[in-house]
Regions:
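Conserved alpha-helix/loop element of class I SAM-dependent methyltransferases that forms part
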Residues: 5-36, 47
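Class I SAM-dependent methyltransferase SAM/SAH-binding core
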Residues: 36-92
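A short acidic, Gly/Pro-enriched loop at the edge of an enzyme's catalytic core
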Residues: 91-104
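A short SAM/SAH-binding and catalytic strip from SAM-dependent methyltransferases
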Residues: 102-117
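A short glycine-rich, Lys/Arg-flanked "PGG" loop and its adjoining helix->strand segment in the class I
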Residues: 117-132
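Conserved class I S-adenosyl-L-methionine
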Residues: 132-158
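Short alpha-helix
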Residues: 158-180
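Core SAM-dependent methyltransferase catalytic element
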Residues: 173-176, 189-206
Length: 206
């Protein structure tokens, strides 16, 4: 199994992992200029919140790790951009009013231990109507295999939320999925299973 959470990113594009296509290719985030964006969990050595600020967004980020926040704050200083950082659990979004965020992004933070229902409800609350919630997780099928060995080593859903569980949680939180990418590593186009699942869901209702 691969752990994409700590993959290195270079800050030049919104990243879903160092071995898969970024948003310059997928275009699920799109143009973030002048948008108020929220990164849920700091991903990479240069977090996506810094990258989005470099691209003209008004960036906000939250992460439970003080060390991650300090490191990301320094990355923002080094990049000469302003990012509003908060230390706390991803669903602890009480510092945000209702319907104030134009885009929410969560890359490789959702696990079996995540209270997905609460997180998705809180993201729905802070997003503007029809705004996008984009998240990336290790593809559930990638956890079944070890590398490119086609022998199943674990049961589907034993170590990661299944696609069905994620889809149902989004539906119950009043989101509608409009984009889903099952990404294989760019250097392994014939891999046994996709390594990364990227989903964009739109907020329904107010």
């Amino acid at each position: 199994m691969s752990d994409a959470r700590w993959s290195v990113t270079d800050g030049r594009a919104i990243s879903f992992g160092s071995t898969v296509s970024n948003d310059d290719d997928l275009r699920v985030c799109g143009d973030v200029r002048n948008k108020r964006v929220l990164e849920l969990g700091l991903f990479g050595t240069i977090p996506n919140c810094v990258t989005m600020a470099q691209r003209g967004a008004r960036s906000i980020a939250i992460d439970p790790s003080r060390e991650n926040v300090q490191r990301a704050r320094q990355a923002a200083v080094n990049s000469e951009v302003s990012v509003e950082f908060h230390e706390g659990e991803l669903a602890d979004l009480g510092f945000l009013m209702n319907a104030v965020i134009d885009l929410a992004l969560c890359v490789h933070q959702v696990t079996l231990d995540t209270d997905i229902a609460r997180l998705f409800r809180q993201v729905h609350r802070v997003l503007r109507p029809e705004a996008g919630f984009i998240f990336a997780v290790p593809h559930p099928m990638s956890a079944v295999f070890d590398g490119n060995d086609a022998t199943a080593r674990r049961r589907y859903g034993d170590t990661t939320p299944t696609i069905g569980e994620l889809a149902m949680a989004l539906q119950r939180a009043n989101f509608s999925i409009d984009v889903m990418h099952e990404l294989k590593p760019t250097h392994q186009p014939n891999a046994v299973a996709p390594s990364t699942l990227v989903v964009r869901a739109r907020k329904l209702g107010s």
